From Swiss-Prot:
GO cellular component terms given for this protein: ribonucleoprotein complex; ribosome
Organism: Synechococcus sp. (strain RCC307)
Protein name: Large ribosomal subunit protein bL20
GO molecular function: rRNA binding; structural constituent of ribosome
Keyword Cytoplasm set for record: no
One protein family per Pfam: Ribosomal_L20
GO biological process: ribosomal large subunit assembly; translation
Length: 115
């Protein structure tokens, strides 16, 4: 059986990992074995955090809405419940934007939820 030399294949595989590890500190960006470990961990973290980002932003929006709602004399849960009863279909992202950028507009939304 003929001998198979994997020069190009192996080099390309290593260079792909080292390209992904560019910018990593110290040997994590230059040595293949440590770079491979760091890249694997970085890709795992990226995968996890793409899902976590959605949760984190929702928590941020709820905290902002709650703070603005309490300034208008109503809790977050009562505000959301009132909006559902009043059939005001506005999502939490837009409510948070209203609370931060247009407090007077947010007051009208709170008034609609109270009635």
């Amino acid at each position: 059986m003929a001998r198979v030399k994997r020069g190009n294949v192996a080099r390309n595989r290593r260079n792909k990992i080292l390209r992904l590890a560019r910018g990593f500190q110290g040997s994590n960006g230059t040595l293949f074995r440590t770079a491979n470990q760091r890249v694997m961990k970085a890709l795992c973290n990226a995968y996890r955090d793409r899902r976590r980002r959605k949760r984190d932003f929702r928590r941020l929006w709820i905290a902002r809405i709650n703070a603005a709602a309490r300034m208008n004399g109503v809790s977050y849960s009562r505000l959301i419940g009132g909006l559902k009863k009043a059939d005001v279909r506005i999502n939490r992202k837009m409510l948070a934007q209203l609370a931060v950028l247009d407090p007077s507009g947010f007051e009208t939304v709170v008034a609609a939820a109270k009635s």
